[in-house]
Each structure stands twice: as structure tokens, then as C-alpha cells.
Amino acid sequence: MDATAFPYGLRVLVVDDDPTWLKILEKMLRKCSYEVTTCGLARVALDILRERKNKFDIVISDVNMPDMDGFKLLEHIGLEMDLPVIMMSIDGETSRVMKGVQHGACDYLLKPVRMKELRNIWQHVYRKKMHEVKEIEGNDSCDDLQILRNSFEGLDEKSLFMRSDSDTMRKRKDVDKDHADQESSDGNTVKKARVVWSVDLHQKFVNAVNQIGFDKVGPKKILDLMNVPGLTRENVASHLQKYRLYLSRLQKQNEERILGAARQDFSHKGTSENLNLRSSFQEQPSNIANGYPHASQNIQTQANMLDSQLEDTKSTVPLPVPDKKRTLASDAADSQNVTSASSLGGVLSFKSMPVNQDRKPSETMILECQAWTGGIPSKQFMQYPKHNHERCDLLGDYSCLPKPDLEHPVGPSNLYAPPPLISMSCGMEGDARDFSDVKPAIMDCIKSLSPALTCTVDSVSVQLSDSVVTSIDGDLKSSGVDGLPSIKDCCLDQTNSQGSLRPSQEPSIIGSTELASLPEDLPSYPLHGVSLENIGLSSIDLLNYSDAMILSGLQSNWYDDLEFSSEMMDYPSIDECLFASS
């Protein structure tokens, strides 16, 4: 066997309580040219090691022994002799192997032990010796370096008294340089020179990164491309890592800035939209009576439009109203058409009438109402009644009209749109005045419109432009006014050039009705138990009426067979009549 290939004379101590395995291991180790000493007990082996200190290079011990655990023996050897110990056992459980390694075993062998494993145990001895040599050399070099540093510091203290400050700084730099040379010459304490990344050096680095590509960049490629003497791969790798962190931080800051600006714009836009929406909701009419709800949102919208037009009024004519409170009594036949508070005669809803097709729809909404006489413009007025569960005196409190010009003839051809709001108060039997109390100017106006009027009492059929509106039967009676026929059932057919009246029963005189006094020359129509309200500009809806009414020639389109009961309305029942126009 070649002596250079294998270390001869390695001193080995074998400890095992099994004599058979002890003999086998001794023979195998001697074949490897090792010097072998055997022992059957752990305590005996420990005594041998203490007596023959520094006479053994390595110890091989079994884990399971009767007098002492193998791990306990391992601890004693590691503390007292500091020798490499190899543990062996039949049981190869992982927990036991890990326990041996944790206690300081350099290897763990399983029985039966192979020859190859025993032949390589010298490596553990060699590693142990190398560590000892390095520790000794390290301690010696540290002592030498400490001596040099002390001498240099003493030299610096002397130079403080002998030279100026500038010379002292120069000397200190030279000494530091000498220290660096000494440390670099020492192989055990090698200290790398620190690289200062100047502006030019960093610019070369950035140019190399851009040339290679940020996705494909690597320290070796950058180092080769920069070609700077004294620059190592570790320096480039460290600087590349810092450069990547710097770029990621910049990108994060830009993203946060963009998101912050977008969030600010969104919040500003949302605030403005909320303000606009809130202002639109706050534009509700402030003069709506307490507890007087509306039937639909369209009515409330039209009320807002009419309230905005009231600001332009310059002169008003108040209408006197009787002071006495009256209640509207309902007949048994009309009980199904009234609400729980009082009877509601009906509501006629005027919407936009496509009379003048030349005007645009947007102009129609803001167009001032033309007067009934000769197309003279007049102001538009509308107010809402206060609902106090009593009789609403609409004429005296809420209605006012400009004085019309009676010089111009009044007729259906001169009507452009429905008239402004005219509120009329009509009572029932018991406390009333005859129509003869109305001023002659009103009577003349009604007479002039008599060819286009239609009166109904019990059953009414009004037909305008091929549209029929029917009413609910009522038991009230009506009377003519100054030559107008009093009819209980009549029909107006607009297909003929002149209206025709078809009486079906004998006319009867009105019992006890009352009409509130109107201003002079008021171009209005008496209406009993009916409420007309302008809530749109496109159609006319008949809701409900049960008493006699007189309508002038209205130039509009009427919806067919639209009839609603007052119970479907959200309005509380009122005892007056409303004419509304726009």
C-alpha cells in the first residue's frame, strides 16, 4: 500500500460493550494501518484518555453501554480532551443521530460498519488539526497587529507636538495606508479596499446597465463592460442592488402621486355633483301649504316652474272672498267619489297643447302666457292653498289676475294656451248666491263664449278632437247664466262647425250655490265642484268631476277615456275649483 495515499499510524480508541464487535472493529482498523486501542466500558475509556493525554487522535464509541451513555461520554471527551468522536449504533433512528451531532459527534456510523467508512475517518482528524492551526495563527496575527497599532498611535501622539495640523493629517493618512497594506498582506485577516462610487463611476455603471438592458443585466456583464481596474464583481453586485431599490422607490412614489391626484379630482368632482344634486332638491317651493301633498312629481315640478315666474309680478288685483266658512255636503250617490275629509269634485290637468307647431319645445316651457284678449301678454300667477281642513278661500288669498282688455274679441281662434291660474270658490246648497250677483262684465264675457260652452249635471260627454272624456254621475243641478241654457245632459261635438246641444231631460233650476265674487272684467268661467290644474304642456287628463261646469273653447288635445277617482289622488279633498294654465 502506498504510504503517501493513506496516513499511517493514526491512533484510534474503540469503546464497545460487545466483545464480538470490538474484535471485528479492531481487525478492520488494523488493516487500515491504524494504531488501535480497545475498551469494553465507557468509564474505563475515560480514565485511559485522562491518563494518556495527547496519546490518541480519534475515539470511536458505541451509543448503548451499560455503565454510561455514549452521549455522556461524548460530552466529557469534548470538554476535557477536545478530540473528534465518532458514534456508532445498530439503531439508525433519526432522533438519535441528530442528538449525537448536537452533542459534538463528527460522524454517526451504523452497524455493521463498512470498510470504506473506517478508511476515511482520518479526514475528521485532519479537519480538526486544520482548525487548531488556524486558531493559533489567528491569535498570533492579532497580537502582532495590536502591537503595530499601538506603535502607530504612539507615533501620532508625538507628531502632534512636533508638526502642524496639516502635517499631522498627512501622516495619519500615510499610517492608515500602511495599515491597509499590512492587513492586505496578511492572508488570515484580508480586508477588501472600499470602493467609492463617484459621479463618473456611477455614470459608467448606468450607461452599462442601459446598454445591456435592465431585464438582462448582471454583475459580471456590468463589470466587463465598465472595465474599471480595482473594481470587483462584489462591488458591482452591491451597487446594482442599491440601484434597483432606488428605481423601485421612485416608481412607487410616482404611482402614489398619480393616485393621489386622481383621488383628489374624483373627490372634487363628486363634491360638485353632490352640491348640484342637493341644490336641485332644495329648489322645492317654500310656500306649499302644510300637510298638502301632491299626486305626482310632475305636479311638484310644474309648481317649481310657476313659483319661479311669480317673481316677475308687478301688479295684482285682489279678489274679495266671503268671510263665512262653508262646508261642502256630499250626496249619497257621490259618496264613492269623495275622500275621508271632504268631497273632491275633480281635477282637470292641462298639459302642453301642440297648437303652435312653429315653436320649439324648449321655448314652450318658458314662454309667457298670452292673454285671452287679442294676444296681449299678461303676467302669470299661481299660489297654493293652505290646507287646514276648512274651506279654502282661494280667490281672496291665492289668486290675482291682470285686468283684461275687452276691446278684442274672445274666441277659440285667439287662444294660444290655457289661461293663467283662476281660483274659484263654489259652495253647495244652503248658503249661496245666484249667478246674477256676478258683475255684468263677467256675464258678458260668458255670453260671448256661449257658442263654445258645454254644461253638464248628471252625465257629461265632452268630445274634442275625436277624444271623449266622460264624467261620473252626480245629483247636483245647474242653472243657466243670462240666456245660457240649463241642461242636465248635453254634448258638444266639435266635428261640426257650430256646437250642438242635445238635451235629454228638462232643465232644472240650481238650488243653493255660491260663487265667490270675482274682479272686474275677469275673463273666466264659472265651475262648480271642479278643479283644473296645469301640470304639463303635452296633454289633458280628466280626473273626476261631479257637478256642472262651463268650459270655454279650449284648443288642445284631450286623452281618451281617462278617468280617475278622487280616492286615487294624494290631494286632500278641497271645496274649491282651480283653473291653472301656463
From Swiss-Prot:
Keywords: Activator, Cytokinin signaling pathway, DNA-binding, Nucleus, Phosphoprotein, Transcription, Transcription regulation, Two-component regulatory system. Two-component system major event consists of a His-to-Asp phosphorelay between a sensor histidine kinase (HK) and a response regulator (RR). In plants, the His-to-Asp phosphorelay involves an additional intermediate named Histidine-containing phosphotransfer protein (HPt). This multistep phosphorelay consists of a His-Asp-His-Asp sequential transfer of a phosphate group between first a His and an Asp of the HK protein, followed by the transfer to a conserved His of the HPt protein and finally the transfer to an Asp in the receiver domain of the RR protein. It comes from the Eukaryota. It is found in: Nucleus. Residues 11-126 form the Response regulatory domain. GO terms for molecular function: DNA binding; DNA-binding transcription factor activity. PROSITE patterns: HTH_MYB, RESPONSE_REGULATORY. Residues 189-248 bind DNA. The modification 4-aspartylphosphate is found at D62. One of its GO terms (cellular component) is nucleus. This is Two-component response regulator ORR26. The lineage of its organism: Eukaryota, Viridiplantae, Streptophyta, Embryophyta, Tracheophyta.
